[in-house]
């Protein structure tokens, strides 16, 4: 009887049953692996959305994981570039303030130079007028004289010539030595006469 059992071939039904029993055992590890993969992918997606810079990392780095060294370097570079831009903007603002402060200073300097030039011109004109007024007091003039500066200088030159001629003559030495006031009056009168004669002779000659 034992020989019949051992030697009897396995029926197809029994083989199918054994295969069907082994298939669930194989499917169970495969399904377990798939579940583990789904859990890992869900954890990665959750970490990428909740992590700091996840959106920027997804947009910039593409498939890089959040918090990776490459993403950290890129974040540092972008932060450094922003800081440099801010520093450049600050430098530009400083240059604008310096140029804006320089233009009013130059305008004030020009105004100061103009004021100083006007003051010097007024002082020069005032001193010149005072000198001509003193010269008119020295030169004997007629009541009808309204001399300009050039005419005053010409009359002064003629008066110097007249005084030279008086000093060369010997007739008025004894008469003018008596009184200086009388001498001055006589000189003024003589100069007026000499001047009128000279003007008459000049007009007659022309």
UniProtKB/Swiss-Prot annotation:
Residues 1-18 have a biased composition (Low complexity). It holds the Pfam family HLH. GO terms for molecular function: bHLH transcription factor binding; DNA-binding transcription activator activity, RNA polymerase II-specific; DNA-binding transcription factor activity; DNA-binding transcription repressor activity; E-box binding; histone deacetylase binding; identical protein binding; protein domain specific binding. Changing residue 185 to D/K/R: High transactivation activity. Changing residue 187 to G: Low transactivation activity. Residues 34-43 have a biased composition (Basic residues). GO terms for biological process: aortic valve morphogenesis; cardiac neural crest cell development involved in outflow tract morphogenesis; cardiac neural crest cell migration involved in outflow tract morphogenesis; cell proliferation involved in heart valve development; cellular response to hypoxia; cranial suture morphogenesis; embryonic camera-type eye formation; embryonic cranial skeleton morphogenesis. Gene3D superfamilies: Helix-loop-helix DNA-binding domain (4.10.280.10). Subset of mesodermal cells. Induction: By TNF-alpha. Changing residue 195 to E: Intermediate transactivation activity. Changing residue 186 to A/K: High transactivation activity. This is Twist-related protein 1. It comes from Mus musculus.
């Amino acid at each position: 009887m034992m020989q019949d059992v051992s030697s009897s071939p396995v029926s197809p039904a029994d083989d199918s049953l054994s295969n069907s029993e082994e298939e669930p055992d194989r499917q169970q590890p495969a399904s377990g692996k798939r579940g583990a993969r789904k859990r890992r992918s869900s954890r990665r997606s959750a970490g990428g959305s909740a992590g700091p810079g996840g959106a920027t990392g997804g947009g910039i780095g593409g498939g890089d994981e959040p918090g990776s060294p490459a993403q950290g370097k890129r974040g540092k570079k972008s932060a450094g570039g922003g800081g440099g831009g801010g520093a450049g903007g600050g430098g530009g603002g400083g240059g604008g303030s310096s140029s804006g402060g320089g233009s009013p200073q130059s305008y004030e300097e020009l105004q100061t130079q103009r004021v100083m030039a006007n003051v010097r011109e007024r002082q020069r004109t005032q001193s010149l007028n005072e000198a001509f007024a003193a010269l008119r007091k020295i030169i004997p003039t007629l009541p009808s004289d309204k001399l300009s500066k050039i005419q005053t200088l010409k009359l002064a030159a003629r008066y110097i010539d007249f005084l030279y001629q008086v000093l060369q003559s010997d007739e008025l030495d004894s008469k003018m030595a008596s009184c200086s006031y009388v001498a001055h009056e006589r000189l003024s009168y003589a100069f007026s006469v000499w001047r009128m004669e000279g003007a008459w002779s000049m007009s007659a000659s022309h």
